[in-house]
Curated annotation (Swiss-Prot):
Enzyme class: transferase
Positions of the catalytic residues: E498
Protein's name in the database: Kojibiose phosphorylase
Keyword set, alphabetical order: Carbohydrate metabolism, Glycosyltransferase, Transferase
Pfam families, per the entry: Glyco_hydro_65C (PF03633), Glyco_hydro_65m (PF03632), Glyco_hydro_65N (PF03636)
Biological processes annotated in GO: carbohydrate metabolic process
Length: 771
């Protein structure tokens, strides 16, 4: 029997820890997001086990969507297995009803474990220490567990523990305008002779979600862990499943309560087999014990961190904040399931309804490409598996090829809501689903970025090429020919900056459309010359004719690129420079821009203020298209007009700031990005993690300060720059199958090959090296 580790014995070093030192129920929503535990299959928000005022409990399973009475399909808040209530002589103990003598919660990012340490005094003067930890297993993704250490400090008496699975959950429970119930309970039963089972079904497609749970209660000092509960009752409480147990509490004697939970859905097994699957897995989990699964879970995190961890010496704040972003990003992926992706808010909350945006391909995917290539391929396979839906989406909109939706769920069709609210709470039409077309090229771009970093020719031949060709076909049909100017234009769009709608010839969109078609033509040539069997197979499959290819060449050649090479200032879209100009001069306590005086936030489209990086984003993703002076001129112009109302923005300005020499602002933008959730500088951490910002923060560390980039010849270049107080930066990446470790100090840069048989050619500060 394994030794039980108490909180202090299990917890790691301080550099891996995120603390909550004070209880304030007004901050519950923020900490529930920060302390979410997820394994890519399911995510459990960091609510208190016993419940508290102002909480936003959430349990989410990747791929479980439903529309019901909502505007669009949304990620379902499924039954909450985590509730565990404590009673002293029949009186419930809750944080809001007791005097808190001690309080602390700690997220251990190294192990993927959430700890708690509380001492409470009830209204009868009884003092109880409640410590513990919980985890959502990375080893067996269906398993989760909670361990409580309960110690009566000044009394003896009967202590009750209520184990609950709550099926009364709602989506948007705190918002009457949007409140929806997506589930109905179909089974509420006892399980394993000493546990509870709740099975629910979604209201539209009858997708089943099954959760089983049981408790084990024993004295801490008992190495045999004999049950000490003298009473147990199973109670099916309508939509909630419960069991209630009692034991005798003795002064200063610690009792351990282990809660085991297992979750399966009809995506995993047939509906008729769900209860058997849950029961068998739960029985095995309990038989093997809490500690065995915890050890396996921690071992999986050790594997992930062995590549993913980045160390910053000399700046503890940046070091921990960066690690926090990496932790949540790498925890959010399920590399075994190519039918799900990572939503904009991860599995951490209901924000953006669990939908997948361009955030995944442009902001998150680079982390996985260089740190976890297997997961990167899986995320791109999600887009391939949704390719038929993208074809239908294009056809519905009157275009050819494949048009990826702005917001995607489990079907691959457009799921953007039609209505929302502006900054003053006024109802507004949401046009992004109709007009923000650049996502189609973003997906194709991500496919190519993955390929050039991995050389995964199998993926490119069987999946990636088809994505690039069908998206190129979309752009060739989306472009409009203007005869009097003899050029193709892309009108009535929204670029990355969403303050401006219905614009013509957005620079980012036009550049990416041109790139997409050009890359499609290159792939056709490569397939025809070097992979003729694949060439004939794919052109036959998608009915691509030589005549259509010639049309692509014409469109690609004549796409209007709005760039004045003399002025070197790129107009974000036609007419942008004619808008009313405001310059940002003030910043709030989080160093976020404050609206300039006189701005009407209901008419932002009439100004030059922009929501997020647009032209700057373009120059970062296509650096070879612009010289250094052009990058500097455009960075300086747009930086003063960017409100950073999207968490995606600061990281891009940080990297470009480093490229053009604005080091001070680059570091500030990096901290903005790294602490978007830790400091809640967007004010909406309650809705879920800013997953794209997590990816962007990693990009600043590696592509920015770490200086990693790929040149025109496809060679890896490292040209780093460290902030003054940073003594050393160290990171690891995979490059074409080899694992490299890069260490940047003030005076030197070292690169080691840790794995890989092939010789790797790189350039460090312009000097060629072979590893």
């Amino acid at each position: 029997m394994q030794v039980i580790k108490k909180v202090e014995e299990l917890m790691g070093d301080a550099k891996w820890l995120v603390f909550q030192e004070e209880y304030n129920n007004k901050l519950n929503g923020k900490y529930e997001t920060l302390f979410t535990l997820t394994n890519g299959y399911m995510g459990i928000r960091g609510t208190f086990e016993e419940g508290s005022e102002g909480e936003r409990p959430g349990s989410f399973i990747a791929g479980i969507f439903n529309r019901g009475e909502a505007q669009v399909r949304e990620l379902v808040n499924v039954q909450n297995w985590m509730r565990l209530k404590i009673y002293i002589e029949g009186e419930e103990i809750r944080l809001d009803r007791c005097e808190l003598l001690e309080f602390q919660r700690i997220l251990d990012m190294k192990k993927g474990v959430l700890f708690r340490k509380t001492v409470v005094k009830d209204d009868k003067g009884r003092v109880t220490k409640i410590e513990g930890y919980r985890f959502v297993s990375r080893s067996n993704r269906h398993r989760s567990a909670i361990r409580f250490f309960i110690t009566p400090l000044n009394y003896e008496g009967v202590i009750g523990v209520e184990n609950l699975i709550e099926g009364t959950v709602l989506n948007s429970a705190t918002h009457p305008k949007y409140r929806v119930k997506h589930l109905k309970v179909v089974k509420n039963e006892s399980i394993c002779k000493s546990g509870i089972y709740l099975e629910t079904a979604t209201t539209d497609e009858n997708k089943r979600i099954a959760v089983g749970s049981t408790l084990r209660i024993y004295n801490l000092e008992d190495i045999n862990r004999e049950n000490i509960a003298f009473f147990r009752r199973f109670i099916p409480l309508g939509e909630n499943s419960a069991e209630y147990l009692e034991f005798k509490g003795e002064r200063e004697k610690t009792v351990v309560v282990d809660k085991f939970a297992v979750t399966y859905t009809s995506r995993d097994v047939e509906k008729d087999l769900l209860k058997n699957a849950v029961e068998n897995d739960l029985f095995d989990f309990v038989s093997r014990g809490f500690d065995e699964e915890l050890e396996k879970h921690i071992a999986e995190y050790d594997k992930l961190w062995s590549v993913a961890d980045i160390t910053i010496e000399g700046d503890e704040e940046a070091d921990i904040a960066l690690r926090f972003n990496i932790f949540h990003l790498m925890s959010s992926v399920n590399e075994k399931d190519p039918w799900v992706s990572i939503g904009a808010k991860g599995l951490h909350g209901e924000g953006y309804k669990g939908h997948v945006f361009w955030d995944t391909e442009i902001f998150m995917l680079p982390f996985f490409i260089y740190v976890y290539p297997e997961a990167a391929r899986t995320l791109l396979m999600y887009r391939y598996n949704m390719l038929d839906a993208a074809r239908r989406n294009a056809a519905l909109n009157g275009y050819k090829g494949a048009q990826y939706p702005w917001e995607s769920a489990d079907t691959g069709m457009e799921e953007t809501p039609k209505w929302g609210f502006d900054y003053k709470g006024n109802p507004v039409r949401i046009w992004t689903g109709d007009l923000e077309h650049h996502i189609t090229a973003d997906v194709a771009f991500a496919v190519w970025e993955y390929f050039r970093a991995t050389n995964d020719i199998d993926f490119m031949l069987n999946f990636g090429a088809e994505i690039i060709l069908e998206t190129a076909r979309f752009w060739a049909s989306r472009c409009e020919y203007v005869e009097e100017l003899d050029r193709y234009e892309i009108n009535n769009v929204i670029g990355p900056d969403e303050f401006h709608e219905h614009v013509n010839n957005n620079a980012y969109t036009n550049y990416f459309a041109k790139w997409n078609i050009k890359k499609g033509l290159e792939i056709i040539g490569e397939l025809k010359e070097n992979y003729p069997d694949y060439y004939y197979a794919i052109t036959h499959k998608i009915s691509l004719t030589p005549e259509e290819v010639e049309k692509w060449k014409e469109v690609e050649k004549k796409i209007y690129i709005p760039y004045d090479k003399d002025k070197k200032l790129i107009e974000q879209f036609e007419g942008y420079f004619e808008k009313k100009d405001y310059v940002i001069e003030k910043f709030d306590e989080n160093n976020m821009p404050v609206w300039p005086e006189g701005v009407d936030v209901t008419k932002l489209g009439d100004t030059q203020l922009i929501k997020q990086a647009d032209v700057v984003m373009l120059m970062l993703l296509m650096p070879e298209e612009f010289d250094e002076e052009t990058k500097r001129i455009n960075y300086e112009y747009y930086e003063k007009r960017t409100m950073h109302k999207s968490s995606l923005s600061p990281s891009m300005y940080a990297i470009m700031g480093l490229k053009v020499g604005d080091h001070r602002n680059a570091y500030q933008s990096f901290i903005r990005s790294a602490k978007v959730d830790l400091a809640d500088n967007q004010g909406n951490a309650v809705e879920g993690i800013h997953a794209a910002s997590c990816g962007g923060t990693w990009q600043v560390a590696v592509f920015g300060f770490g200086g990693l980039e790929i040149d025109r010849e496809g060679v890896l270049n490292i040209n780093p720059w460290l902030p003054e107080k940073w003594e050393k930066l160290s990171y690891k990446i995979f490059w074409k199958g080899s694992l490299l470790e890069v260490t940047v100090a003030k005076e030197e840069v070292s690169v080691k090959k840790l794995k890989g048989r092939e010789t790797v050619k790189i350039k460090v500060k312009g000097k060629e090296m072979a590893l």
